[in-house]
Design a protein with these regions (language model features):
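Extreme N-terminal starter segment of soluble prokaryotic enzymes
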Residues: 1-4
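Short beta-strand scaffold segments in enzyme catalytic cores
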Residues: 10-15, 132-136
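A short helix->loop->beta-strand "cap" motif at the edges of active sites that frequently abuts
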Residues: 19, 80-83, 99-100
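Pre-active-site segment of Zn-dependent metallo-hydrolases
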Residues: 19-61, 73-74
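Metallo-beta-lactamase
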Residues: 20-21, 27-29, 86-144
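Active-site neighborhood of phospho(di)ester-bond hydrolases with catalytic His/Asp-centered motifs
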Residues: 23-24, 57-70, 85-87, 144
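Metal-dependent catalytic neighborhoods of phosphoester/phosphodiester hydrolases
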Residues: 72-81
Length: 144
């Protein structure tokens, strides 16, 4: 399993068997939305992912409804065939951003994406129930 922190904050890229999953993608050079009152910061590259990495993405997982996890422009940059996995609550936020295609609910029973299994687990105070954590297991039984 290849695990890559794809930016300097929240975006994770996992690949096994030529299929990849992105978790909480923020794939922009801009580090805050335009409407933020804070000083705008930018980075030199949108992410550490190569063009080849992008092509391998089969699914996106959104773990929180906050803008640093749910960056609509990054999600919309992928083809509609890329599946989105999230919670029922976060699905509502996606709909408000105009992201309505191919959204699936992930829970503690888990879902297989490529050769990996992803299970949603509850987070602690103060984030639960708005967010979830992940237990990820590859085809060799390795977990993160």
């Amino acid at each position: 399993m290849k695990l890559l922190k794809a930016d300097n904050y929240q975006t994770w890229f996992l690949e096994e068997g030529g299929k990849a999953v992105l978790i909480d993608p923020w794939l922009s050079k801009q580090l805050q939305p335009d409407n933020r009152i804070f000083i705008q910061r930018k980075r030199n590259q949108a992410s550490l992912l190569s063009d080849e990495d992008y092509k391998k993405v089969q699914a996106i997982i959104i773990t929180a409804p906050f803008e640093d996890h749910l960056h609509a422009e990054s999600i919309k940059s992928f083809p509609k065939s890329v599946k989105i996995f999230t919670s029922k609550l976060i699905k509502k936020f996606l709909y408000r951003q105009g992201i309505v295609d191919n959204i699936h609910i992930i829970n503690a029973e888990g879902v297989d994406i490529g050769l990996m299994n992803f299970k949603a687990l509850p987070t602690g105070f103060p984030y639960y129930p708005a967010t979830f954590a992940l237990l990820i297991e590859d085809s060799k039984g390795r977990r993160i």
